[in-house]
Amino acid sequence: MPPKASKKDAAPAERPILGRFSSHLKIGIVGLPNVGKSTFFNIVTKLSIPAENFPFCTIDPNEARVYVPDERFDWLCQLYKPKSEVSAYLEINDIAGLVRGAHAGEGLGNAFLSHIRAVDGIFHVLRAFEDKEVTHIDDSVDPVRDLETIGEELRLKDIEFVQNKIDDLEKSMKRSNDKQLKLEHELCEKVKAHLEDGKDVRFGDWKSADIEILNTFQLLTAKPVVYLVNMSEKDYQRKKNKFLPKIHAWVQEHGGETIIPFSCAFERLLADMPPDEAAKYCAENQIASVIPKIIKTGFAAIHLIYFFTAGPDEVKCWQIRRQTKAPQAAGTIHTDFERGFICAEVMKFDDLKELGSESAVKAAGKYRQEGKTYVVQDGDIIFFKFNVSGGGKK
């Protein structure tokens, strides 16, 4: 019996997302000097996927690719017992510390800001610990001041970019009556006013057409942020930190993005222990590493999801950006799959787990056949059918 055709071929249309439309997105670690960025990156690097798993990629010393933990993936591997298991991963870039005046080229300013432009989201590491042995660039620990310093530098660089864009558009408008130039000019003026009002681009009320234009700019304040509050091991264990309430209040007033308290000192201690010893230490102290949560939160923040292909040969996560349609998702496996796309046969993970087998999912009428307009959902288990000249089906 053929799979049941879906009555609803597409999910309700969402507003376009700010950012690059790609399955190869990455997140950068940002912060002032001596806040724990490099320590955090070194901890993550210990968990990174060996370079031989990416034979056609050069991984720079300031890049790490780490597995995204997922109980669904683990369950599928238990069910199918495949010859090959391929998890999703998050690419994390370590970015040099920023100083006040970076937008004007102070310190490593220009390099720093160009590196942020090259990533798709930000892990903003904040120092919330006092240590006389670790100097602070401003001679005192004040994470809210640090938040404002970095926020202002990014906004000032965006204002500079938008002003240059306005100047270029005005020159072009003298030579052409193209309506698109006028639309872009009007948008740039709105964006500049928004930034000069102390607001980041990602919190603007932009129309779909605006977002399409903004995505060509790769503005720094358009990128999603996850705040990582680095506290002492003692504060982390007792779940109390004097700086945290003020950080929460500031973030709530400025967009309300995710805050994750953690401790580089504690995570480094765990990373240096054998796994069984680390597990025992966590159990005895009723505490756990927050690195898996940080990885999963960062992955979701840059709008990445993944679908599964599953069978006895391989269980694999295929990462795509949210709002990706079935043919483009098929193209992440092979370009022929997109070119000759016929349909996607889709199971929901929860249905498979509840019913126990593909045959049971089919018998329950929950094995769906989706067309070209279907928007792939996180955790879909998909079997693509395609046909190209001289080709076949998967």
Curated annotation (Swiss-Prot):
InterPro entries named in the record: ATPase_YchF/OLA1, Beta-grasp_dom_sf, G_OBG, GTP-bd, P-loop_NTPase, TGS, TGS-like, TGS-like_dom_sf
- Using the record's annotation, list all stretches that form the OBG-type G domain: 25-282
Subcellular location per the Swiss-Prot or TrEMBL entry = Cell membrane; Cytoplasm; Cytoplasm, Cytosol
Lineage: superkingdom: Eukaryota
Task: Indicate what this protein is called per its UniProt record.
Answer: Obg-like ATPase 1
GO BP terms: namely:
negative regulation of defense response to bacterium; negative regulation of response to salt stress; response to salt stress
Any Gene Ontology CC annotation: cytosol
Task of the protein:
Hydrolyzes ATP, and can also hydrolyze GTP with lower efficiency. Has lower affinity for GTP (Potential). Exhibits GTPase activity. Exhibits similar binding affinities and hydrolytic activities toward both GTP and ATP. Binds to the 26 S ribosomal RNA in vitro, but not to the 5.8 S or 18 S rRNA. Confers sensitivity to salinity stress by suppressing the anti-oxidation enzymatic activities and increasing lipid peroxidation thus leading to the accumulation of reactive oxygen species (ROS).
Looking at the record, the residues that make up the TGS domain are 303-386
TM helices/strands, residue ranges: none
Give the main EC class: hydrolase
PANTHER family in the record: OBG GTPASE FAMILY, OBG-LIKE ATPASE 1
Q: Which residues bind ATP?
A: 34-39, 56-60, 94-97, 230-231, 263-265
Which GO molecular function entries does the Swiss-Prot or TrEMBL record give?
Answer: ATP binding; ATP hydrolysis activity; GTP binding; GTPase activity; metal ion binding; ribosomal large subunit binding
Primary place of residence?
Answer: membrane
What family is this protein classified in? Belongs to the TRAFAC class OBG-HflX-like GTPase superfamily. OBG GTPase family. YchF/OLA1 subfamily.
Q: Which UniProt keywords apply?
A: ATP-binding, Cell membrane, Cytoplasm, GTP-binding, Hydrolase, Magnesium, Membrane, Metal-binding, Nucleotide-binding
Residues that bind GTP, according to the entry? N34, V35, G36, K37, S38, T39, F129, N230, S263, C264, A265
Q: What is known of its domains?
A: The C-terminal domain is involved in RNA binding.
